Amino acid sequence: MKIQYLGLCSKKMKKYSYIFYYFLLLVSCENTDKQNTIDIDLSKTDSCIAYSMFVKSVENLDLHITDGLPITGVERLYFDESKIFVKDSGREGILVFDKGSGNLLKRVNPFGEGPEEIKRISSFCLDTYHKKICIFDQSDMKVKMYDFSGKYACSYPTDMFFIDMAKLDKNSMTYFYPIYAEEQFYGIWSSDSLNQLKKQVSSHVTKECMFHYFPMLYNMNDTCVYYYDRNWDEISVVTSDSIQTLYSLGVKQRIPLFKKGIRDITPQELDGYAILPNFDCSNNFILCSFHTFDKNDIRKKNITWVLLDTRTGKVTISKKLKNDLMAEDEIENNSLFYMNNYTWLRVDDSFEDLIRLKILHLQ
């Protein structure tokens, strides 16, 4: 868990008091003209959220790791038609696997000081238009491109810092920086390969937004992403030139805005407040995990799951996410990844010689 404090906040968060009448998730990138507010109280929990409430079936896919490759954990997962791209949470770079067999095809790990090498992978995404792996190397402020076989292709400099990026258009890149900054763009914008601004997509960032909790949160869905904005606890659809809010989450235990930018904030000041590490969207469901801070151990994993059935409006909250469709040991981590609107994934990376993907085929 990484927490970054980037300034002082002084304004209290806006409190939502709207009455929620119905739920409707419009998952099409072209049809997102409704906004709903969902009230969530993480203290009101049920015994469990069972897979059978939102999953049709579970399938295992083992990704086979070469002997001696010390994987720390899975930080990112991306897919194309035939390959799976895994970002290691340590220093092992990006691993490329065959989507059918799970065999390791390539390890993209060109760490070094040369112009074609990487000093630090600050973020990465796939360019499915040109079949490229895009890596932002913060150390020399360049976006470096590698083909799907791991061979260096090209790079371009950027004078704008960003937290994450997504390739949503053939001729531009979309960047995310949800932190207030006086000397550069903030919010969401798109630029071409010459670093020329094409569109300021969103500037919904105020001077109080000086706090960020890693990692960034979006579900990649072809020409759009489903984006979770932790400043306002909003789920939106973002394209290369537009943004539309789908839901606002009125989490009772959310961190007040005035606390988020306090430097050297103490565990006592965060005690009992919650923030969202992961979420997934689909045609019929949204699944979120919330981490609640403990004053006695700020790094303690204290996860509460929230499942929203967008067809009925039912919200289920529980400390336990249970696989009742398959007899197996429960996954110890709180991983949650998005493949598409019909498929989510959890990851068991506790094995030495493989990464086991739990493929959740949704209702």
Write out the residue ranges for each language-model feature.
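A short helix->beta-strand "capping" segment at the edge of beta-propeller domains
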Residues: 44-71
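Bacterial signal peptide processing site
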Residues: 30-32
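Residue-level detector of Asp-centered blade-edge/turn motifs that repeat once per structural unit
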Residues: 79-81, 126-130, 168-171, 220-222, ...
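Short coil/turn segments at the loop-to-beta-strand junctions that recur within blades
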Residues: 67, 109-116, 158-164, 203-209, ...
